[in-house]
Amino acid sequence: GIPCGESCVWIPCISSAIGCSCKSKVCYRN
């Protein structure tokens, strides 16, 4: 639930390496 400061409209979350995932076009962590 914490924004990772990254969007995932066109590309996947690079921050997924630290546990972030795409929700509503924005990368979130927990």
From Swiss-Prot:
Keywords recorded for this protein, A-Z? Cytolysis, Disulfide bond, Hemolysis, Knottin, Plant defense
* Disulphide bridges, residue numbers: 4-20, 8-22, 13-27
InterPro entries in alphabetical order: Cyclotide, Cyclotide_bracelet_CS, Cyclotide_sf
Q: Does the keyword Manganese apply?
A: no
| Superkingdom assignment | Eukaryota
At what sequence positions does the UniProt record place the cross-link Cyclopeptide (Gly-Asn)? 1-30
Asked whether the keyword Disulfide bond is assigned, the reply is: yes
Gene Ontology biological process: defense response; killing of cells of another organism
> Which tissues is this chain's protein expressed in?
Expressed in leaves, petals, petioles, roots and runners (at protein level).
Post-translational changes noted in the entry: This is a cyclic peptide.
Report the family membership.
Answer: Belongs to the cyclotide family. Bracelet subfamily.
State the protein's purpose: Probably participates in a plant defense mechanism. Has strong cytotoxic activity against a variety of drug-resistant and drug-sensitive human tumor cell lines, and against primary chronic lymphocytic leukemia and ovarian carcinoma cells. Has weaker cytotoxic activity against normal lymphocytes. Has hemolytic activity.
Note what the entry says on domains.
The presence of a 'disulfide through disulfide knot' structurally defines this protein as a knottin.
Q: What is this protein called?
A: Cycloviolacin-O2
